[in-house]
Each structure stands twice: as C-alpha cells, then as structure tokens.
Amino acid sequence: TQLKERRRIDFIIVDSAGKTTDEGIKKLCLVSDAVIVPTSLTQNDLLVTYQTVADLAPARTLNPRLRIIILPNRIHSATNIYTVRETLKNLDAIILPVMVPQKNLFVNFSTLDAENEYQPIAQAILNNLA
C-alpha cells in the first residue's frame, strides 16, 4: 500500500530469481501493473514459465490490471519469432514480439552496441506498460 501512495514512482523492478511462490513477490503482484517473465525455449525453462504463470494467477484475480508479460530470452539467432510465439502460445500471458538473443560470452564488449541492440526490447516492454 505504501507503493500505491507514493505516485512519484513510475516503475519498480524486482528480480524474483524465479521465486514466484515467495510471499513478498505475491504481495508485490497485488500492487503491480505488470510482471515480466523471461524464458528460454528449453524444456526446463518452459516448465518453470508455465508454473510461474499459474502461480501468478491468483494475483490477477485480486488485481485485474496485472499483466503477465513473457520475454523470450537466450533465443538462438536461427530461431524466428513465429517459432517462439508458437511454442509459447498456450500461456495465459502477453508474449512480447521481440527476443533477447543468445550470446557467446566474451565476444562483444561494447556497451554502445548492447544499448542499440536492446532498445527494441526495452521499447516493447514499455509499450505493454502504457
């Protein structure tokens, strides 16, 4: 409730480390506009993502404006967005039309390149928060 009263805050970002069953995370969902769930397309990540969406369902009942947004993450460059959307289509959530690409560690150290590369992802997230 203190977060609701302090209207000077535009966005609060919390990294739950995948612990959506945590009581603190559940309480945050009651006053949040959106929860962003990053996922890769591995079998394990998909199972966790489906469980995360299910875990957050009760918060949606109490907070009808809560949007669950899926961010495709660590996606191989040869994978197209149609394949991603097809894989995630049964989730009761918004699937962002962008993907965070899989990266080879230590290949690209430029922060400017990273900023340009991730700008469309940030914009897609902001578009879903408006």
Identify the meaning behind each predicted range.
Residues 22-43:
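Inter-motif core of Ras-like GTPase G domains
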Residues 111-130:
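NTP-binding/hydrolysis catalytic cores, primarily Walker-type P-loop NTPases
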